[in-house]
Amino acid sequence: MAEPVRQELSALAAIFCGPDEWEVLSLSETDGAVFRILTKAEGFMDTDIPLQLVFHLPLSYPYCLPGIVVNSKHLTRAQCEIVKEKLLEQAETLLLEPMVHELVLWIQENLRHILKCPEAGGGSEKCSSAASMTVDDGLWMTLLHLDHMRAKAKYVKTVEKWASDLRLTGRLMFMGKIILILLQGDRNDIKEYLILQKTCKVDVDSSGKKCKEKMISVLFETKVQTEHKRFLAFEVKEYSSLDELQKEFETTGLKKLFSECVLRLVK
């Protein structure tokens, strides 16, 4: 399997890291990769419709279209087929580059328009029954761990730019060898940040050559709760001790997160 495809799979796994959002179904040196993504897209009356998207990336991908299967309990079989056709039409405009995340974002933004088309049955009863599934994503929070930064100044500047461009707030935190990024914002914007982090050359390797980030992990992701502090900006902070870092988490309402996810990094 080509390295760019492996990198795309790695980025997708980091982005779709919620419960049951991502599953690799098969990996083969002869047949390529097959994986499943669970997501939601806005349907009729601002209701969220759960979608199961199965992608098959053949060995010639991204020089050819991926195979796509669409399933949803809240859409008819005919509607699922129309959604698949529209996704493939969009994929034709993205050939020669990694496209899966772009396709997921596209269907999230365009499903309601597709379902309004006459061939999709307009406002069918099957779709309107999803009214009870309405979910307001609101503000989300993600904690990331970086293994190292060799080109620290450039890396920090890049992270600050991404956070600003995507309207994300939070902290880039340094304490000894520990590097953490705490992000707050729209869930799709956080996922877009993750794909940038995974696919752009943000650091240098041991020989000084520019390289992509391969050692990032998502420690935690949740919807922001009432006890969590809302950050007004994205700031870079350095801490001289573990106690000082712990106090930052405690004042943010994340004491449990610190004990469960951060402490194990220093053990």
UniProtKB/Swiss-Prot annotation:
Residues 7-114 form the RWD domain. Keywords: Cytoplasm, Nucleus. The keyword Ribosomal protein does not apply. InterPro entries: RWD_dom, RWDD3, UBQ-conjugating_enzyme/RWD. GO terms for biological process: negative regulation of NF-kappaB transcription factor activity; positive regulation of hypoxia-inducible factor-1alpha signaling pathway; positive regulation of protein sumoylation. The keyword Nucleus applies. GO terms for cellular component: cytoplasm; nucleus. It is found in: Nucleus; Cytoplasm. SUPFAM superfamilies: UBC-like. The RWD domain is required for the sumoylation enhancement activity. PANTHER family: RWD DOMAIN-CONTAINING PROTEIN 3 (PTHR15628:SF1). Interacts with UBE2I/UBC9, NFKBIA, HIF1A and NCOA2. Enhancer of SUMO conjugation. Via its interaction with UBE2I/UBC9, increases SUMO conjugation to proteins by promoting the: binding of E1 and E2 enzymes, thioester linkage between SUMO and UBE2I/UBC9 and transfer of SUMO to specific target proteins which include HIF1A, PIAS, NFKBIA, NR3C1 and TOP1. Positively regulates the NF-kappa-B signaling pathway by enhancing the sumoylation of NF-kappa-B inhibitor alpha (NFKBIA), promoting its stabilization which consequently leads to an increased inhibition of NF-kappa-B transcriptional activity. This is RWD domain-containing protein 3.
